[in-house]
Amino acid sequence: VQIQVTGRHVKVTDDVRDYIHSKAHKLPRFYDRIHDIEVVLDHESEQFTAEMIVRVDRKHTFVARETGPDTFALIDLVVEKLGRQLTKHKEKNRNHKHDDKSDYVSEG
């Protein structure tokens, strides 16, 4: 999985970058067709904003955004949100691909 980390109005330290990579590498557990992950950290008026964009199957994009004072906590929250979104997407795909044929009973 390709992970790109960008900072707007803030320098992304190696500790933060390593933390993002360790958390982002857990996302394929929720959905294994992740193409790439983009993380944008922004600092504005005493608040940080963490935005994570996950592209899957080359046609679906999932975005999670959080704002707060602690960068590490924001990353945790964003990864948690994306985990829920990816799980929901996976379940949705699973349910659409397999129609339940048990409702159709052949009478003979």
Task: Identify the meaning behind each predicted range.
Residues 1-108:
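N-terminal, polar/charged subdomain of small-to-medium soluble alpha/beta proteins
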